[in-house]
Amino acid sequence: MLAVLLCFGLSFGLGLRPQTSNLVDSKGKKQGPWVLRFENGSKKSEGLFKDGRQVGRWVYFTEQGKLKSEMEFLVDTSFTNAKFYHPNGKVAGEGMYKNKKRHGRWFFYDTDGNLISEERYLKGLLNDTIKQFHFNGKLYEKWVYNQGLREGLWEQYFDSGTLKARGVYKNNNMQGHIAFFHSNGRLALSGFYENDLRHGTFTYYHEDGKVRVVLRYIHGELHPADRSKVQIPETKEYVPEEYLKEQFRQKGYSDY
């Protein structure tokens, strides 16, 4: 009889084992260790709360159990250090948040760990000089942002390091003279933009420096008299290529 009572008491005691995670205090604030899970039961995130605020290191996972990101919530501040990962475990991006908005310098990497872009943010908006890189590490492109708008000099480079293109932005629009170069350094194209539209004369050159064709534009439209001339691909050469960053975004590494 005593043995039965002891077993019953032991089982009852185990059933009343105090909860050690996902706690909420009398004021409704989350406290201590927390673990969140996906519907399939796999771990989604884990970390600490203090008075309802995330503190210290938090880890986030995909539904397949792979590490997705790490956040370091600095105690008693509005700053958070962040690091995101590719599915292969390589770092995809890293930087800092202030009040849950990107702030300061951010770095983005490809799946092999090569740096593909360096960006600067102010209160969640691109600000200052932004750089992108070729896979060989050389500078591919750089331009300047002012509170989320492109403003100032824009340049693009071949993977050899020589200049490929140069133009100027004003209030987020291409404005004024633009020039493209062949890989041998000779001028490939010279023209003008007005409020992000081709306007005026665009001169194309062969690699030996000889003029290939001259085309005239009026507020983005090719002059009727020039439509019968040699066909030149109608591309927005000046638009900065954001393919690599877009790939990063499409993989799901969005802000928390």
Residue ranges, per PLM feature:
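Bacterial Sec-dependent N-terminal signal peptides
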Residues: M1-S21
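Glycine/tyrosine- and acidic-biased, solvent-exposed loop/turn segments at the edges of beta-strands
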Residues: L14-Y256
